[in-house]
């Protein structure tokens, strides 16, 4: 069985399990949205999934109620919890707040959503992230640069490098990629 067939089989099994097991369904909501959005926007599933793992991966799955406030991660218990924490952070003057499965930054991208609650919706969150990553790929002509820019702006090379290396490590850990000589050299 080829690696590609194995991945499809695993993703199919995950989708089947998610549709038949309510406990898994809530835990795998981000992953299901990733499979759909990756196909819609022509993004290799492994890349979008590895970006998600880098952003909110915890205990083997992505977290729809994750947030990051000014560099400090918080994993909420539900949407009400996260929205309350969001409101508290904004009242304290926090500007850099990332929300949801793919950690969409409210300050830079919030205008594309009707509300912070909408940003936490796994479908909207992952869909927006996939479209954004696809646009970055078109602009920068490589997935590596798209991933780098997803996390940090053009003037933050150290953060971009660290992030790209974390995404590559997640690609390798999940079986979607392997360490190439160039990647190994780059991530030293």
Please tell me what each predicted stretch does.
Residues 11-20:
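Bacterial N-terminal signal peptides
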Residues 26-188:
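Catalytic glycan-binding domains that act on GlcNAc-containing polysaccharides
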Residues 2-12:
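Bacterial N-terminal signal peptides that target proteins for export
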């Amino acid at each position: 069985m080829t690696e590609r067939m194995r991945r499809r089989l695993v993703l199919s099994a995950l989708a089947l399990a998610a549709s038949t097991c309510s406990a898994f369904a809530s835990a795998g909501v981000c992953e299901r949205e990733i499979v759909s959005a990756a196909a819609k926007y022509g993004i290799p599933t492994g890349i979008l999934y590895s970006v998600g793992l880098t952003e909110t991966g915890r205990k083997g799955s992505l977290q729809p109620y994750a947030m990051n406030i000014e560099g400090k991660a918080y994993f909420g218990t539900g949407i009400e919890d996260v929205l309350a924490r969001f409101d508290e952070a904004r009242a304290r003057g926090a500007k850099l707040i990332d929300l949801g499965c793919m950690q969409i930054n409210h300050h830079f991208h919030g205008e594309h959503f009707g509300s912070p609650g909408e940003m936490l919706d796994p479908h909207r969150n992952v869909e927006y992230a996939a479209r954004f990553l696809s646009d970055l790929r078109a602009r920068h002509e490589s997935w590596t640069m798209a991933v780098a820019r997803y996390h940090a702006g053009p003037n933050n090379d150290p953060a971009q490098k660290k992030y790209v290396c974390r995404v590559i490590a997640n690609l390798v850990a999940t079986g979607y990629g392997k360490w190439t000589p160039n990647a190994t050299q780059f991530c030293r």
